[in-house]
Amino acid sequence: MIAKRIPGVEVLRVFAIFMVVLIHSTPEYTNGSGTNLAALILQSVSRAGFISFFLISGYFALNEKIVSLKKYYYNRVVTIVIPFLFYAYIHYFMVHYDFGRAANALSGFFSITTLADFLHAVIIGPAFNGSMFVSLHFWFIYWIVGAYAVVPFVGYVIQRIEPSSRLKSIAFLLGVSWLHLYVNRYFPNANIISIPFIADGWFVYFLIGGLLYGLELNKYRKYAFVCCAIGYVLTVFLTWFNFSMLSIYQAPYGIDINMVLCVCGFFIIFQTLRESFL
């Protein structure tokens, strides 16, 4: 069974947590803003750090040996869904009852109506709930629940791809993703036949994480530093270029080539850290 604790990857988890905090505490890049230099410097690294979570999740989840589907799904409900519902209910209550200061706060917390409204909001989801507020920041939980729901089936395929073919598989996934991404971004009016693509760029990172398992990553360590540097510089440049030169108000923070270089570089560097170094 794949080890659940690899020291270097644990350090990467901590780094990624700090990068999520950095994302939400630094300005976004916008035309004419006086904080754009800070945005370019900080957002360019924090976004890549955040995406590391998807590679880490795929690396472990897609290579897990699942013996019992019943036990697998039970464990995921207990460790992901139930804690989420518990925390989200408290969050929902605090938002709707003035952080517990409302006159009817105590009765509202134990109200069937509050519970029913909360479940309604959870089912609708953070993107479409309107006044039935569930924080947009919970989107990651919805994503991870969906990803883990298909892990037994996707992982079955991933685990049967030979190590010698895994880099080719990654190249294929990225080729399909980049073709769709860049044609639609830079040639939106091009009259081209529908291009197949994987709908969610985060899931591509998840798959890449799964495919990196079994590779001798130490061989790529020296290249990983170069990838990080190139990816970072490209992120800074493309963010400025898209906004200032092309009037495409979209930062390259998704499955873009710059992010892939930086994220994969981060993962290889941290995954290959020796315990003696830590």
Language-model features: locations:
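Hydrophobic alpha-helical membrane-embedded or membrane-associated segments
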Residues: 51, 79-83, 87, 172-176, ...
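Hydrophobic alpha-helical segments with transmembrane-like composition
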Residues: 54, 60-63, 80, 91-103, ...
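Functional transmembrane helices that form membrane-embedded active or gating regions
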Residues: 2-17, 73-74, 78-81, 220-233, ...
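Alpha-helical transmembrane segments of integral membrane proteins, especially early/N-terminal helices
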Residues: 4-16, 90, 100-105, 166-169, ...
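Non-cytosolic membrane-interface motifs at loop->transmembrane helix junctions
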Residues: 35-44, 190-199, 247-256
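Functionally critical transmembrane alpha-helices in membrane proteins and complexes, commonly lining
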Residues: 7-64, 80-88
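Aromatic-anchored segments of alpha-helical transmembrane domains
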Residues: 18-25, 88-89, 172-186, 228-242
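Alpha-helical transmembrane segments and terminal signal-anchor/GPI-anchor hydrophobic tails
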Residues: 199-200, 217-278
